[in-house]
Amino acid sequence: MGLLNTNIWQDHDSELARISYSARMLYLLRGAICLDRMELAKRLGVTWPTASNTAEKLQKIGALRTVAQEAVSETGSGKSSYSLMVNPDYGYFVGISIGSSEIKLVVLDFNFDPLSKVSLQDYLCFYAESEGNPVVFDWRKYLMQSDATTNGYIKIPTPESAERFSATINQIVNGLIAADINQQNQSPSTAKHLLGIGFAFTGAVDVENKTVTESFNLPFLRGISYKTLISPSNREYLESQNITVSFQHNAKTVAIAEKYYLQKNNSPLGESEDIVSIYLGTGIGCGLIL
């Protein structure tokens, strides 16, 4: 989880630069699947030692893993005895979209791929009740997609008051915390940690202060913030585990997702500098990457 905690490298400017190299390296590997260190250095525009040191840090925390050369020979790499790829099991990210009528939740692995229905069930402890454990949040009532091989997601009706909304969100967060603790208890050395939770809202969002400043479709969300929405006990756990929580406008999240989707799927548009997304819901939103 240290990868997402910028405090670990805030003592020196030269070390801060490595955070950028780490993020860029992960971005490249999520699109290229696997690359050797020489090719990574070339694409990052840095020296081989810089790329190698960055990769070593990411490997040390488990974010990258090596692949034997024979397994990647068709990629044209061929410059090293092994190549590097993102370890999808390093940790998970949760996206929660707050709509006028529905709250939707999806879980992504570290390679930014949505979990299948079966994997989602496993991660969210769907079967904990049968093992004699208390159910923190009954995800089963809200699981979508009938095909086990397709991406699974959770869909919950949006409550109609601030009190019920806050209660529902905290039940969801409680369930995510329970899943995270369950992962650590089952296998601490290989636990798939919860790395971050992102909330996407309609209206106007102050991203830096994690506050919804205006909400036209859900007026009771006006002025709600991370500190007022998430209970103290849940915040304490999230912060103690360095789990990042972010607020963003839903149309902007669509633009960001489109950027990563194009890059991950090696689309000719993946390197486009300008992307526009139009979000059609109860209202109309627009996200821009320029």
Role assignments for model-derived ranges:
Residues 40, 117, 122-274:
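Glycine-rich phosphate-binding loop and adjoining helix at the ATP-binding site
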Residues 24, 28, 229, 257-258, ...:
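Alpha-helical scaffold segments in soluble metabolic enzymes
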Residues 2-86, 209, 215, 243, ...:
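Nucleotide/phosphate-binding catalytic cleft detector across ATP-hydrolyzing
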Residues 78-119, 123-125, 141, 277-290:
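Gly/Thr-rich phosphate-binding beta-strand-loop-beta motif of the actin/hexokinase/Hsp70
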Residues 66-68, 244-250, 288:
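General beta-strand structural signal in soluble alpha/beta enzymes
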Residues 73, 102, 114, 206, ...:
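Flexible, glycine-rich phosphate/dinucleotide-binding loops
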